[in-house]
């Protein structure tokens, strides 16, 4: 008997909704990364994208513990000389809450071509509504 290896066409994908309201950013991100990667499935295969689609709602209501709102920084570069842009997470959550959650999840996924495919299955929304009702997503509870 040999080890089971999932094939890309055998994978059945589900849709899950995670409500981030009042939840810690790291807890939401780890659960989302786990679902995107497919680690919760018995058919998990490291070199095949076995993950599911994840919808995160209420990204603006996610919380950070301690002093991270003021101390933690979001750094990006425009590509031009002197184009380094730095903002703290309080500003980032106020202006682009989706980016804060996406960056946290993206950091927990493999940094290769398979990881880039996995991140495309992540949908993050600022409020509590999303346009994916037709996919009949299941609610994924996070214990805080």
From Swiss-Prot:
It holds the Pfam family Ribosomal_L13. Signal peptide: none annotated. Keywords: Ribonucleoprotein, Ribosomal protein. The keyword S-adenosyl-L-methionine does not apply. InterPro entries: Ribosomal_uL13, Ribosomal_uL13_bac-type, Ribosomal_uL13_CS, Ribosomal_uL13_sf. CDD domains: Ribosomal_L13 (cd00392). GO terms for cellular component: cytosolic large ribosomal subunit. GO terms for biological process: negative regulation of translation; translation. GO terms for molecular function: mRNA binding; structural constituent of ribosome. PROSITE patterns: RIBOSOMAL_L13. The keyword Ribosomal protein applies. This protein is one of the early assembly proteins of the 50S ribosomal subunit, although it is not seen to bind rRNA by itself. It is important during the early stages of 50S assembly. Part of the 50S ribosomal subunit. Belongs to the universal ribosomal protein uL13 family. PANTHER family: LARGE RIBOSOMAL SUBUNIT PROTEIN UL13M (PTHR11545:SF2), RIBOSOMAL PROTEIN L13 (PTHR11545). This is Large ribosomal subunit protein uL13. The lineage of its organism: Bacteria, Bacillati, Bacillota, Clostridia, Moorellales. The gene is rplM.
């Amino acid at each position: 008997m040999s080890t089971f290896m999932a094939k890309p066409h055998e994978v059945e994908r589900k849709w899950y909704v995670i409500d981030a309201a009042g939840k810690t950013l790291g807890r939401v991100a780890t659960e989302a990364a786990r679902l995107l990667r497919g680690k919760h499935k018995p058919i998990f295969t490291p070199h095949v994208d076995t993950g599911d689609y994840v919808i995160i709602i209420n990204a603006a209501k996610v919380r950070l513990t301690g002093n991270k709102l003021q101390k933690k920084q979001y750094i990006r570069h425009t590509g031009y000389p002197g184009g380094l842009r730095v903002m703290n997470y309080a500003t980032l959550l106020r202006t682009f809450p989706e980016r804060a959650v996406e960056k946290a999840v993206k950091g927990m996924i493999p940094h290769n071509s398979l990881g880039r495919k996995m991140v495309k299955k992540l949908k993050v929304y600022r409020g509590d509504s999303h346009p994916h009702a037709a996919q009949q997503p299941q609610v994924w509870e996070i214990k805080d």
